[in-house]
A protein has these predicted regions:
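A short, structured beta-strand/loop element
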Residues: 209-211
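Active-site-proximal beta-strand elements of phosphoester/diester hydrolases
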Residues: 213-216
């Protein structure tokens, strides 16, 4: 039996003046090895993307993390704090793709930037600099550490709702590599996990949606070695129609 297709919108990457559509391979590997689905990369030029056609063939969509941020013009009147870290081509594809996928009840999983896109697409807002907000911690990547330490477990999350039910734990440890975070939660989303400072780090879509999960951390990192990450990707794969037994 053919594996169900999971669409993965790319990021823009400029190399020697040429624009490339790129995705870190660990996302594609997680879709293939943990969710048991076939990853299919989606280019970012909106002129090349027929959202209806993508959703006609995709049984699920993974919205990945990225070095870039969602342009604040999509959720506030604020100027971007880091204008050099925007990816307008990605915004132009992912935000309408999320809204249409929700309407068509296509399973979605959203990670880091993708998690923030999910919130913005559905009417929520973001902190552009979490570490500058009173009472919130610094969740940014610690680049002075080794790669293994940077991507390893850093702080606990308190779980609730469906996420707690799936994982069977009240608390988990997660990595932390993000500068932005949810400020106002979109009305259609439900909070599922909280950091020690109260920041919402996981959300779920409406109950009637087959699978709509967003997480602020990076479960794709060494996914097959992490039982919690495997649970999330297997749930996603099963919702997309994969045989995850």
């Amino acid at each position: 039996m053919s594996r169900p297709i999971v669409a993965i919108p790319c990021c823009s990457k400029i190399i020697e003046g040429y624009t490339f559509d790129a995705v870190s391979r660990q996302y594609s590997a997680a879709v293939a090895h943990a969710a048991h689905c076939q990853p299919l990369l989606i280019p970012l030029d909106i002129a090349l993307v027929d959202i209806g056609a993508v959703l006609d063939v995709a049984k699920g969509i993974l919205f990945t993390g990225s070095p870039s941020n969602v342009d604040p013009k999509h959720y506030s009147a604020e100027e971007p704090v880091m204008p050099d870290k925007l990816d307008p081509a990605r915004d132009a594809v992912t935000l309408p793709l999320i809204r249409t996928a929700l309407e068509r009840k296509i399973p979605m999983m959203a990670i880091c930037r993708g998690y923030q896109e999910l919130n913005v697409a559905l009417g929520g807002t973001l902190h552009q600099e979490v570490h500058e907000q009173e009472g919130l911690h610094d969740h940014r990547e610690r680049k002075e550490l080794s790669l293994e330490e940077r991507w390893g477990p850093r702080h606990p999350l308190k779980l609730k709702g469906r996420l707690r039910e799936w994982i069977g734990q009240d608390e988990i440890m997660v990595n932390s590599l993000h500068g932005q975070g949810i400020k106002d939660l979109a009305p259609l989303l439900q909070p599922e996990a909280f950091a020690e400072d109260g920041l919402v780090e996981a959300v779920r879509g409406p109950d009637e949606h087959p699978f709509c999960l967003g997480v602020q951390w990076h479960p794709e990192w060494r996914v097959t070695e992490n039982p919690v990450s495997m649970t999330l990707f297997r749930k996603f794969g099963a919702a997309a129609g994969a045989d995850v037994s």
